[in-house]
């Protein structure tokens, strides 16, 4: 974590007073579960807190920037900005994916590149930063890391894998593509969905995500990787 602390200070001028908070923010549940005897804390509670402060800050930004937009339009914009694919992108932008501690099984299954894990990590970091430095420092970090991309709209550049999969399969004839939720796990504030995509009633691939739509996109992405 020494390298992470140096990076945060160099890139963002952030020095954590409570190093345990930072360490917890970068500890996935899979790592904590594999080291239960050490009683290691994981980042789910910090994620919960970070999600709340991020919702507030983005809501405030949108409210100020778009004084003529209705509540429904503002909600849609906020959802686009704080969805897991966007937050995972910001985690990668900050280099956070290199520092998260994962269990061996999660690491082997590609967890370090999984949007749901990296999106949660970004929120957990914000939660830890809030507790250590206060909301103004979180606000400054969000303004530096996120808002420039929000202004340019680059946070929206997420591939629609479902459409790509549909176009690929239908280029070979009529097919029936179906997405089914096969598993739900996690606490109410951090649900994780597993979705299976099938073609003509034959299972093709699976995906996971913090929402059903995100899990469907992940399943379609995995299916495309298999077919192409």
Curated annotation (Swiss-Prot):
Its EC number is 3.1.26.3. Coiled coil: none annotated. The active site is at residues 51, 123. It is found in: Cytoplasm. InterPro entries: dsRBD_dom (IPR014720), RNase_III (IPR011907), RNase_III_dom (IPR000999), RNase_III_sf (IPR036389). One of its GO terms (molecular function) is metal ion binding. GO terms for biological process: mRNA processing; regulation of gene expression; rRNA processing; tRNA processing. It is an enzyme of class 3 (hydrolase). It comes from the Bacteria. Mg(2+) binds at residues 47, 120, 123. It catalyses: Endonucleolytic cleavage to 5'-phosphomonoester. CDD domains: DSRM_RNAse_III_family, RIBOc. Keywords: Cytoplasm, Endonuclease, Hydrolase, Magnesium, Metal-binding, mRNA processing, Nuclease, RNA-binding, rRNA processing, rRNA-binding, tRNA processing. Homodimer. Digests double-stranded RNA. Involved in the processing of primary rRNA transcript to yield the immediate precursors to the large and small rRNAs (23S and 16S). Processes some mRNAs, and tRNAs when they are encoded in the rRNA operon. Processes pre-crRNA and tracrRNA of type II CRISPR loci if present in the organism. This is Ribonuclease 3. It comes from Streptococcus agalactiae serotype V (strain ATCC BAA-611 / 2603 V/R).
């Amino acid at each position: 974590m020494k390298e992470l602390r140096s990076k945060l200070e160099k890139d963002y001028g952030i020095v954590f007073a409570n190093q345990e908070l930072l360490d917890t923010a970068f500890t996935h549940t899979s790592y904590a579960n594999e080291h239960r005897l050490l009683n290691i804390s994981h980042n789910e509670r910090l994620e919960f807190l970070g999600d709340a402060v991020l919702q507030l800050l983005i809501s405030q930004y949108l409210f100020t920037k778009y004084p003529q937009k209705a509540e429904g339009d503002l909600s849609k914009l906020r959802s686009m900005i704080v969805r897991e694919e966007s937050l995972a992108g910001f985690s990668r932008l900050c280099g956070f994916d290199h520092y998260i501690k994962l269990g061996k099984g999660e690491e082997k299954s590609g967890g370090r590149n999984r949007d749901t894990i990296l999106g949660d990590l970004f929120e957990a970091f914000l939660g830890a930063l809030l507790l250590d430095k206060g909301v103004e420092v979180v606000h400054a970090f969000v303004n530096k890391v996120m808002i420039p991309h929000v202004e340019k709209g680059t946070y929206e550049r997420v591939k629609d894998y479902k459409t790509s999969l549909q176009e690929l399969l239908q280029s070979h004839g009529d097919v029936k593509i179906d997405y089914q939720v096969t598993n739900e796990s996690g606490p109410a504030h951090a649900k994780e969905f597993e979705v299976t995509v099938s073609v003509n009633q034959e299972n093709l691939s699976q995906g996971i995500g913090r929402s059903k739509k995100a899990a469907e996109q992940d399943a379609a992405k995995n299916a495309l990787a298999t077919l192409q």
